[in-house]
Amino acid sequence: MKFIIKLFPEITIKSQSVRLRFIKILTGNIRNVLKHYDETLAVVRHWDNIEVRAKDENQRLAIRDALTRIPGIHHILEVEDVPFTDMHDIFEKALAQYREQLEGKTFCVRVKRRGKHEFSSIEVERYVGGGLNQHIESARVKLTNPDVTVHLEVEDDRLLLIKGRYEGIGGFPIGTQEDVLSLISGGFDSGVSSYMLMRRGCRVHYCFFNLGGAAHEIGVRQVAHYLWNRFGSSHRVRFVAINFEPVVGEILEKVDDGQMGVVLKRMMVRAASKVAERYGVQALVTGEALGQVSSQTLTNLRLIDNVSDTLILRPLISYDKEHIINLARQIGTEDFARTMPEYCGVISKSPTVKAIKAKIEAEEENFDFSILDKVVEEANNVDIREIAQQTQQEVVEVETVSGFGPNDVILDIRSVDEQDDKPLKVEGVDVVSLPFYKLSTKFGDLDQSKTWLLWCERGVMSRLQALYLREQGFANVKVYRP
């Protein structure tokens, strides 16, 4: 089998040296992706296309599908490469290939020709088209908007019968641009923004800020692995997980409620910039869209950018949510995003939309920056190829209960402000307060002879924290959902 790879048009308008470099990189990317399907596969580059030849017919569909997901490819032609003697021979081969496909259809013939021949491309179109029209009674020629377009390519003494055309994702080959670090949360925005930078030729590494709980990290790892495996598997990338729970705890205790969102984002940018500098990455990528939430106003984004010299790319800055969700659906991350928990432990009740720099800096003076340095130093760096094996390990499920027994105690893990606004009172059972950001250090001090029923407003935080505690060896935890 043979495939002809057509280049993304922006590649073809580059200077000769740049075009050759892009084609060379794309050829290497194709080899890296397809070698898993057929080790005997051959990839040959030309000035205006790339040929892929493989022997294992059983892998035809898999190879074709993989090619449509490699950045830099405009479209793929699946062809049958045969010799020919003259124009009538071209017609006979086209008739044998397309007879069944043209029954009862309108059609036209389009020919591309390279090399020296006694005929022109238009002459071949007329001869083959007329012959097909005569020999297939139910077929009819229609030059504009036909049901079927018969594509033929003539190159020297070879005829390429095009059996199918399949659209690629376009863009530039990965590796033609410099590396970036995507701040991935597993939601709609960060997945789409990561894809857009891969499509533009960047090798995308991933940085995840874990706000508490293994289940959330496993979910985000699966999203990152899916994006890499589907669109970027030609290159090795990193997945860096930073335990941001201590930072969140410090913010909740030391920072004014209205400034929390902006301060948290500034801390994330500081941490990600340190990671980027460590690995020689040139830019950060976020899924922020203008005005989508309170921290994404121009004033707040400017304040967030000011904490680092690292370039921050926001490919979705002018996109609305509906457009982003449609893109997530197209690339296959929608289902991941819909089931990803909305982790909102640091959402202010009255967040500022126009933060003042002096006020933000004054709030940050209360913050212990050694905590930030420590979590970055202890960040977990994983080769993304190892994630598939790690995520196959079962996550311990935690029992969810709606009632309680004589030995049960409800543990309210909401932030202090939330508890003050809406105190939890349940008849017939004790209620103890311990904010989620203190669980990792304070839960062990509680009476371990009791069964602790973790509770929060939405049930997401309580489940994540219960999973975390189970991983730490505490079996006496459940989730309370009345």
Curated annotation (Swiss-Prot):
Protein's job: Catalyzes the ATP-dependent transfer of a sulfur to tRNA to produce 4-thiouridine in position 8 of tRNAs, which functions as a near-UV photosensor. Also catalyzes the transfer of sulfur to the sulfur carrier protein ThiS, forming ThiS-thiocarboxylate. This is a step in the synthesis of thiazole, in the thiamine biosynthesis pathway. The sulfur is donated as persulfide by IscS.
Name of this chain's protein: tRNA sulfurtransferase
Per the record, the domain of life is: Bacteria
Q: Which family does it belong to?
A: Belongs to the ThiI family.
Q: List the InterPro entries hit by this protein, alphabetically.
A: Rhodanese-like_dom, Rhodanese-like_dom_sf, Rossmann-like_a/b/a_fold, ThiI_AANH, ThiI_fer, ThiI_N, THII_Thiazole_biosynth_dom, THUMP_dom
Q: Which gene is the coding source of this polypeptide chain?
A: thiI
Q: Which residues form the active site?
A: C456 (cysteine persulfide intermediate)
Q: Is Iron-sulfur one of the keywords UniProt gives this record? A: no
Q: State where ATP binds.
A: L183, I184, K265, G287, Q296
Checking CDD domains in the record gives:
PPase_ThiI, RHOD, THUMP_ThiI
Q: In which pathway does it act?
A: Cofactor biosynthesis; thiamine diphosphate biosynthesis
User: What organism does the record attribute this protein to?
Assistant: Salmonella newport (strain SL254)
Q: Which reaction does it catalyse?
A: [ThiI sulfur-carrier protein]-S-sulfanyl-L-cysteine + a uridine in tRNA + 2 reduced [2Fe-2S]-[ferredoxin] + ATP + H(+) = [ThiI sulfur-carrier protein]-L-cysteine + a 4-thiouridine in tRNA + 2 oxidized [2Fe-2S]-[ferredoxin] + AMP + diphosphate; [ThiS sulfur-carrier protein]-C-terminal Gly-Gly-AMP + S-sulfanyl-L-cysteinyl-[cysteine desulfurase] + AH2 = [ThiS sulfur-carrier protein]-C-terminal-Gly-aminoethanethioate + L-cysteinyl-[cysteine desulfurase] + A + AMP + 2 H(+)
Where in this chain does the entry annotate a coiled-coil region? none
Q: What positions does the domain Rhodanese occupy?
A: 404-482
| Keyword field | ATP-binding, Cytoplasm, Disulfide bond, Nucleotide-binding, Redox-active center, RNA-binding, Thiamine biosynthesis, Transferase, tRNA-binding
Q: According to its record, what are the GO cellular component terms? A: cytosol
UniProt keyword Transcription present: no
Disulphides = C344-C456
Q: What is its EC number?
A: 2.8.1.4
- UniProt-recorded Gene Ontology molecular function terms: ATP binding; CCA tRNA nucleotidyltransferase activity; tRNA binding; tRNA-uracil-4 sulfurtransferase activity
SUPFAM superfamilies xrefs: Adenine nucleotide alpha hydrolases-like, Rhodanese/Cell cycle control phosphatase, THUMP domain-like
Domain named THUMP: which ranges? 61-165
Q: Where in the cell is it found?
A: Cytoplasm
Among SMART domains, the record links this protein to: THUMP
